[in-house]
UniProtKB/Swiss-Prot annotation:
Induction: Expression is positively regulated by the atrR transcription factor. Expression is induced upon voriconazole treatment. Expression is increased in clinical azole-resistant isolates. In particular F20140, F18304 and F18454 show over 25-fold greater basal expression levels, whereas F19980 (7.2-fold), F20063 (6.5-fold), F20451 (3.6-fold), F18454 (5.1-fold) and F15483 (2.1-fold) also show significantly raised levels of basal expression. GO terms for cellular component: plasma membrane. One of its GO terms (molecular function) is ATP hydrolysis activity. It catalyses: fluconazole(in) + ATP + H2O = fluconazole(out) + ADP + phosphate + H(+); itraconazole(in) + ATP + H2O = itraconazole(out) + ADP + phosphate + H(+); voriconazole(in) + ATP + H2O = voriconazole(out) + ADP + phosphate + H(+). It comes from Aspergillus fumigatus (strain ATCC MYA-4609 / CBS 101355 / FGSC A1100 / Af293) (Neosartorya fumigata). InterPro entries: AAA+_ATPase, ABC2_TM, ABC_trans_N, ABC_transporter-like_ATP-bd, ABC_transporter-like_CS, ABCG_dom, ABCG_PDR_1, ABCG_PDR_2. Pfam families: ABC2_membrane, ABC2_membrane_7, ABC_tran, ABC_trans_N, PDR_CDR. Disruption phenotype: Leads to decreased azole resistance, including itraconazole, posaconazole and voriconazole. Pleiotropic ABC efflux transporter that shows a strong substrate specificity for the azole class of drugs such as lotrimazole (CLT), fluconazole (FLC), itraconazole (ITC), ketoconazole (KTC), posaconazole (POS), tebuconazole (TEBZ), and voriconazole (VRC). Is also able to transport rhodamine 6G (R-6G), a known substrate for many ABC transporters. Required for normal pathogenesis in a Galleria mellonella (greater wax moth) infection model. Belongs to the ABC transporter superfamily. ABCG family. PDR (TC 3.A.1.205) subfamily. Residues 1-21, 815-843 are annotated as: Disordered. This is ABC multidrug transporter C.
Amino acid sequence: MSLLGTINPNINPERTVAGRGTQEEEGEIARVEHNHHNNAASVSTDETVLERSKEIGDEDVAVEEVTRLARQLTRQSTRFSTSGNVENPFLETKEDSTLNPLSPNFKAKNWMKNLLALSSRDPERYPKRVAGVAFKNLSVHGYGSPTDYQKDVFNSVLEVGTLVRRIMGTGKQKIQILRDFDGLVKSGEMLVVLGRPGSGCSTFLKTISGEMNGIYMDEKSYLNYQGISSKQMRKQFRGEAIYTAETDVHFPQLTVGDTLKFAALARAPRNRLPGVSREQYAVHMRDVVMAMLGLTHTMNTRVGNDFVRGVSGGERKRVSIAEATLSGSPLQCWDNSTRGLDSANALEFCKTLNLMTKYAGATVAVAIYQASQSAYDVFDKVTVLYEGRQIYFGRTDEAKEFFTNMGFECPERQTTADFLTSLTSPAERVVKPGFEGKVPQTPDEFVRAWKSSEAYAKLMREIEEYDREFPIGGESLNQFIESRRAMQAKNQRVKSPYTISVWQQIELCMIRGFQRLKGDSSLTMSQLIGNFIMALVIGSVFYNLPDDTSSFYARGALLFFAVLLNAFSSALEILTLYAQRPIVEKQARYAMYHPFAEAIASMLCDMPYKITNAIIFNLTLYFMTNLRREPGAFFVFLLFSFVTTLTMSMLFRTMAASSRTLSQALVPAAILILGLVIYTGFTIPTRNMLGWSRWMNYIDPIAYGFESLMVNEFHNRQFLCPDSAFVPSSGAYDSQPLAYRVCSTVGSVSGSRYVQGDDYLNQSFQYYKSHQWRNLGIMFGFMFFFMFTYLTATEYISESKSKGEVLLFRRGHAQPTGSHDVEKSPEVSSAAKTDEASSKEATGAIQRQEAIFQWKDVCYDIKIKGEPRRILDHVDGWVKPGTCTALMGVSGAGKTTLLDVLATRVTMGVVSGEMLVDGRPRDQSFQRKTGYVQQQDLHLHTTTVREALRFSALLRQPAHVPRQEKIDYVEEVIKLLGMESYADAVVGVPGEGLNVEQRKRLTIGVELAAKPQLLLFLDEPTSGLDSQTSWSILDLIDTLTKHGQAILCTIHQPSAMLFQRFDRLLFLAKGGKTVYFGEIGEKSSTLASYFERNGAPKLPPDANPAEWMLEVIGAAPGSHSDIDWPAVWRDSPERRAVHEHLDELKRTLSQKPIDPSKADPGSYDEFAAPFTIQLWECLLRVFSQYWRTPVYIYSKTALCVLTALYIGFSFFNAQNSAQGLQNQMFSIFMLMTIFGNLVQQIMPNFCTQRSLYEVRERPSKTYSWKAFMAANIIVELPWNTLMAFLIFVCWYYPIGLYRNAEPTDSVHERGALMFLLIWSFLLFTSTFAHMMIAGIELAETGGNLANLLFSLCLIFCGVLAPPQSLPGFWIFMYRVSPFTYLVSAMLSTGVSGTNAVCEPVEFLHFDPPSNMTCKDYMADYISTRGGYLENPSATSDCTFCTISSTDTFLSAVSSHYSDAWRNFGIMWAYIIFNIFAAVFIYWLARVPKGKRTKGST
């Protein structure tokens, strides 16, 4: 029987049972035991315990008590099985039963005990599966680049040498992460792993759980999983030791219930209780785990993520915990899984783990960065890590004593976990008087002290004893294999780590696939509707094609477009596969299913959509356009279209699965798509393909589909040739017999009114009917080959992993020190190591604040679903220079909202009340004169720390301050914040670059650099940080307040020691009501006396006042209060005193004259810097961002150059024949297709800049939105100019377009014009991208919309359907499309003014009337229509070419060289329109238009 490990009736009686429960739990166990064993032995044992309790502490008695009871429980388990009150909770529970997880009476402990009793009846059916772990000399290393600098466009070129060395196997530096760890965690024990971020906690947990991606164990390392070797555990038993990362990755569209039911089904054992089906088992287990973690109410709520609305962040974290719990692994490693949970829920999590270890025999290791004393006490063992070294491993209750005996002191009210972690920080550890110089200082000294201790010797003896008891490969391994075998499906391989069979895995993933579709059908429906609309548009463009030869080109173009739309309808699968990849990889690590099983399921789940789409799209298109109206022909068309879709889907999936990052996949995908399009056989017929590139046509699956569709359309049909299409025609020629005339279409025969479809295909395309079904077989071959490569790649290629928080520096600015920790470089891990003297010296330069900020009766109302809701309710307070006020409250009390209201950052709703600065209302400069440190550390990832600070200083300090003075001030801020060691380090993205503490310091620094004249707001500055980092941030706040800074700071459940560091407290209850505002007092005496005076219980001496306060007002989980504390405050003398003081401040301060010497001429301006400075600084920053994002620039360059070269050489030296001119037109048409890829590259960059601007820089009035938009549009200009030059050279010359200008001697002029046209195309693309994304949130949405409009512009530009063939309804689109003018100008510039020469297949053959030469016969026709004769003097078989000049071809497609410069001007009109539209849309959609306020502000 499996729960959260194994419900184990045979717990090894020799080992100590882990976990100390509450007294109530122990009492209940004792009562259960007493009922079953009311005998002398138990009585005597009880007496022994009572006697011993006098000698030793209660805590140890509790341990022994639980140990004894559990042993008795084990020995007497058979008695459980005979007791009559045991029931099967999967089948028989009553609604109000304590075993029913859906009942409010549910008790997890009772449920576990009951299940233990049931499983003990048949130990052979439910063999135990436990896995403790012992490790000796555990050392782990990774590999890094010896010189990891920030890459930019220039120095990336230098990386080629590094790449070569890497391929050769050299140039990598070994980085030691963990050194010589020893420890033993027995089954049923809990280990807490303590250490600062970067000390190796994550690496340690990953190592013992076997997740070794990118890290390697040293050869001397030894691991013993209770008789199982580490290699065997990783391969055969993957999923039995799991690692749960602190990130939460789930399918956002699924409900919580479906997510967890999937996990339960994937690990559902075969040896379930009799009569329990897999479905019943999974549903019940899901319900139990949800009840244990308080998730039952979210059963039908979507999980969600940052973009999809779902459960809250804390609930999502608990979903991750529940999913890992349901995997049923006997060894579980949890990495900072309490992050995002408040202390009460964190404690509940630890208690749940304790239940698992106690009853299920699970082994648990947890890394916690902020552990309360209660949470710490739940654990049995603790290990302390210090910069990759282990400085302690032992019992939790002995750890504190170990270090205090060494000479360290634990300050009053500091939790044991904080004390142990503080030892790893030189600035924070406290040495007892008399031990100075005797205690260890460095990590190595701590290690020596630990390894020479008696505690270490005892640990080594325990490990040796454990190894003797559980030798690797011994009996315990066989028991483990037996247990796994009992769980596994009957037809599952013995050595497989998976529980259910492959077919069950596929079935399970398919059910989930359909649930995902149901959960978010909007994307599927929008694609279906979009494709249907596209079919209607194309169908109307080619509406009701005539059944004659005039439709030959149109039919070819239509089938070409149809096969491409079918082929590329799956291109978006690359993006969707990347979105789900982290989830699939995580669940494969949990051994839920093979990645290829999910891949097969996703293919099958997509089939209904693909079939529906194929029918809707192809049916509409086929019958609107009058393609061959025969049942057989339609179904053949549908078949080949569908097979093309499937084949290309497999190709795109292979590309996504075989690349490690999305950017790796996109550029190759773009070039591949281009190649597939060019070599389909329409843009260049096979007879025109150059010999060296002909092979591309053979490996193009679409080409086979296109040939078969063309054969399906033309085979065995004859098409009438219209009179106007005969040569010669009109005038006297019309009276000539047919024998002397011929149809002008390829494949025609002199004297016939009809052209055979087969002849046209054979001569034009070299297509044959005999190839049709052969092609289907080839396409199936491609499909199965790509399916195989996709499934293989999915199974074996994993996503690229984060490099960890290793600092990167700009080349030439600082030599990176050799870090020995992949997680973070410890040399710069803490500002605690900086010179404190320089920090104190720097405070002298910090802006002194003198203004007092006050607010009175502040209310904030918004409408939610049409109903008014009050978020803040008559809040009063003030902040004075040199003080730090804490703003606290329960979750949802409106703490951040109050900060936003006070800082004038709310953009909706109604604000009322009085907010004054020195007794006067706030003006529009208030926002930039205050600093606001947000909870999220948002920074531009390419900038350095110093640059980020300078940007803030230059734009936010008053304009009259000299530039150099601002820059000097930044250096003072760097010193004050202790950031000298990483001032030139690159910020990076979270997880790579600066660590959490350094980011938080930078966020504070950015606000300080602005020299806030009024006050500093801080929103949750310690959220998500470990206790030591929180302490150092509070140190920094102390330093600022001592220098006269006024600070208002929200804080979430601080420790007792952190809480004591604030001067005043503003405490809010639900609904934004004030509970208390005033002094905190020495040891919280003032605060405590207020609450005690009004009916609260006394504050215990060792309690945390912050937690006590929440319990007093009934806001902590499980607490309740009958007192209405907001009402108590409203009627209190303290509130009256606050109001009196506020009135006095207003009266005295408003009368104080403003010092004219301090008056700043621009003091009341909205922005400190003038617009020109704003634009210049923004431009510099965006330029540097582009320069330092070589992936973007090189992707753009690769896309442009490779596309241009590919097209250029595919159409190399194009001839001026009828087909050759058409090919040159398609070479221009194909160049337009890079539009979509360029847009997809531009938009994410813009979104990065915009999110930073809107969240942090706009509210603080750093610079205006006009400067932001202008800078982002201008920055593309130089890069587009460079790209235009590269495209021009790589495309224009290989095709040979310059030769067409030689007859008119205009090579230079036309070359320059062609360059300008390409340049205008790239400028149009970038400005169009900005116009599309300006008002839209997501780059993906903007990209899809831009591509839709681009497709319409391309359809109507006159290439696929000439304007004269368009229905009248669509002529306006032809005129509106910018590509109409661009393609026309480029085509006429490229080919006008030269002679045209037919290919042999294009010549028409006919006889002249008797007694006439060909020249005599054709003279009148040639003079009016053009063309030339190959054999003018012949009297039979005239060989005639219909065009003699390229201008004839141009006029047929409505293009004239005389319009080229005009069209270039029109393109500029479009570009300017795009710019103004982008600015207008941004203003309309995203610029706040002000808010409604009442009262004085």
